[in-house]
Amino acid sequence: MNPFWNMSSAAVRKRSDNDEKIATGDQKISPPRSSSAKKQLPSIPKNAVPITKPISPSPSVQPTNGTHASYGPFYLEYSLLAEFTLVVKQKLPGVYVQPSYRSALMWFGVIFIRHGLYQDGVFKFTVYIPDNYPDGECPRLVFDVPVFHPLVDPVSGELDVKRAFTKWRRNHNHIWQVLMYARRIFYKIDTTSPLNPEAAVLYEKDVQLFKSKVVDSVKLCNSHLFDQPKIEDPYAIIFSPWNPVLHDDARERMLAQKKSEEQSKGLHVSGLSWVKPGSVLPFSKEENSLQT
């Protein structure tokens, strides 16, 4: 037991009435009490309020990126906006994406394949981003119609993204890299640890049959190109057959803009010319006649 609570009352002195008036005098010290008279802590009343502050039953969870939990939604929105800006700046050939209207964690996209085994293929897909981005797993990419490919699940249509991004590293990996990877798989076939074993075996053993399967897959995907989106969203990518009334004017404006840009790039920068017109001699110039 703490010696403080064993302290006896030997230090307590008994003074008489006369001793209080006289500065000097005999003082009697009371004998120490028996051990049975030790000080005891008083019992805590049932309705007593503790002095210490109560511990919060559910402490606030701090995100791994060091951002306060209350800033989480704003930080996520800013991160996704920055990611989409990077996608636009990269100008990935044949790849187009559009964030969903209902959720910034879902992006709609389409890939146009212009050459190779999957030439003329138009593959629509959806990107699903984790809600704890960029500290979670890598985004998922799922094709609307499963493509016959070793790295695409033949049932769900999901691309094996983790093959290229085993661990998603914030500030190092970006969504545009996932889109570039999705485009690259159609030009460089990888058959190791496939999600579609049949496609991998055919590519290794019978290339002609693999090509035939790919052609059928491209035709199947293109046949569903005009279908309504599986997810109802105002920003979902929708294709419609060519309508001259609607599309001819837009096509002409696009071509005119492209032509003007090419012409502006071909113009020489204005400045001094060091070659006389009709002459091949450098630093030649026209002689101006001065009138007096």
From Swiss-Prot:
One of its GO terms (cellular component) is plasma membrane. This is AKT-interacting protein. Belongs to the ubiquitin-conjugating enzyme family. FTS subfamily. Residues 14-23 have a biased composition (Basic and acidic residues). InterPro entries: Ub_conjugating_enzyme (IPR050113), UBQ-conjugat_E2_core (IPR000608), UBQ-conjugating_enzyme/RWD (IPR016135). Gene3D superfamilies: Ubiquitin Conjugating Enzyme (3.10.110.10). Keywords: Apoptosis, Cell membrane, Cytoplasm, Membrane, Protein transport, Transport. It is a peripheral membrane protein. It comes from Xenopus tropicalis (Western clawed frog). Residues 75-223 form the UBC core domain.
